[in-house]
Swiss-Prot record:
Co-factor binding comment: Binds 1 Mg(2+) ion per subunit.
Keyword Metal-binding: yes
A single GO cellular-component term on record: cytoplasm
EC number from the UniProt entry: 2.1.2.11
Taxonomic source organism: Carboxydothermus hydrogenoformans (strain ATCC BAA-161 / DSM 6008 / Z-2901)
One Pfam family linked to the record: Pantoate_transf
Main localisation: cytoplasm
Annotated protein name in UniProt: 3-methyl-2-oxobutanoate hydroxymethyltransferase
Coiled coil (UniProt feature): none
Subcellular location: Cytoplasm
Keyword Transferase part of the UniProt annotation: yes
Protein's job: Catalyzes the reversible reaction in which hydroxymethyl group from 5,10-methylenetetrahydrofolate is transferred onto alpha-ketoisovalerate to form ketopantoate.
């Protein structure tokens, strides 16, 4: 079965078909997400927070990302796998960016990379695309720049920042990006950006009129009993199910209810008798 491609996503936009993207961080999450029909699996640097326990995405390294990208690729056959470029893997120089992005495709097996930033990285995006590396953009609330942005806030609510986001989207599209994530952008502005560029927009907290949507795997499944951003919809409460299952296991071990006879293996009694 052929994987979803850059062309596939553009055709979906042109046909008015919505794109479903979700994060995946390992073999089982990739397997489940693909079987559920997601066209795109994003190996997000959000793994730093939901998998590795960091306070933000900033500490995530290339080696950590590559480890998880490889697992997601092994767990999928049809979905496009997009690898997040972690903080400082592309900001220092074009050489760094090309080398690291190339590793995601060559070593990791990903089909594309995602970079945070607007017009200021357009030239870099163009160079990566020229080198044969498909690039997904990411504007609005960019988590790697959360310190510079003053926290996790909606972006583009005033005239100056709204115009900049539109200009950024156009610059990335002109540079050859095949899609752009719009994070925490007012819905009306996201709709205007979506209709102003020829490539798909993938929204997260940016309204229903984007060409697609993305959410974090763990948030969708309710795997952490934590406060969620306004834009997250929790479709399950796995944290309760997981804790209850493990609680029952622990209790049965302590009360010698597990393992039962059906969980154990047997041997001939005469063999046991001959052991001394």
């Amino acid at each position: 079965m052929d994987r979803v491609t850059v062309s596939s996503l553009k055709e979906m936009k042109e046909a008015g078909q919505k794109i479903a993207m979700i994060t995946a961080y390992d073999y089982p999450s990739a397997l489940f997400a693909e079987e559920a029909g997601a066209e795109v699996l994003l190996v997000g640097d959000s793994l730093g927070m939901v998998v590795l326990g960091y306070d933000s995405t900033v500490p995530v390294t290339m080696e950590e990302m590559l480890h998880h990208v490889k697992a997601v690729v092994r767990g999928s056959k049809r979905s496009m796998v997009v690898a997040d470029m972690p903080f400082m893997s592309y900001q220092a120089s074009y050489t760094d960016a090309l080398y690291n992005a190339g590793r995601f495709l060559k070593e990791g097996g990903a089909q594309a990379v995602k970079l945070e930033g607007g017009g200021e990285i357009a030239e870099l995006v163009a160079k990566l695309v020229t080198a044969g590396i498909p690039v997904m953009g990411h504007i609005g609330l960019t988590p790697q720049s959360v310190n510079a942005l003053g926290g996790y806030k909606v972006q583009g609510k005033d005239l100056k920042t709204a115009q900049k986001l539109l200009d950024d989207a156009k610059a990335l599209a002109d540079a050859g990006a095949f899609a752009i994530v719009l994070e925490c952008v007012p819905a009306a502005l996201a709709a205007k950006i979506t209709e102003s560029i020829p490539i798909p927009t993938i929204g997260i907290g940016s309204g229903v009129n984007c060409d697609g949507q993305v959410l974090v795997y763990h948030d969708v499944l309710g795997m952490y009993p934590r406060m969620l951003p306004k834009f997250v919809k929790r479709y399950a409460d796995l944290s309760s199910l997981i804790k209850e299952a493990i609680r029952q296991y622990v209790q049965e071990v302590k009360e010698q209810q597990f393992p039962e006879e059906k969980h154990s293996f047997t041997m001939a009694p005469e063999i046991l008798e001959r052991i001394y």
